[in-house]
Amino acid sequence: TEVDLEFNANVVTHSDGYLLHGIGGWQNCLFSKTVILPIPLFRDRVPVIRDQVTTLCGPGELIDVVVTERGIAINPLRTDLIEATRNSSLPIKSIGELKAEADRICGLPAAPSLEERVVAAIKWVDGTVIDVVRQVSAAP
């Protein structure tokens, strides 16, 4: 799983580009009134919040809140949630602050090395292709 600075999410590939598993009904859940993604800030010393997701599975405008063990980021599009939590004791941070914390702890992650060959297509619930998965380059 990855989330980027625009709240886009990836649930189908690892950060190294390798396929993880199918999406299943995950995208359908993005049509909920409030979508909350609970994620670790990093996994195996690899930050989960990235500048850009490796593979787009869900658009950021449908993801409202990212909850990590080190803080909560609310999508700026959800001004109602920002206002509702303004005077709370919740550890609210920007998605950028959470990313900076993960990068400070883990270092900047390497971008995956990918070939041009497409090995999978990521489709939206209506069948529209929203991204592709490319073959990971062989190790030198």
What are these regions (language model features)?
Residues 1-140:
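Conserved phosphate- and dinucleotide-binding cores of soluble alpha/beta proteins
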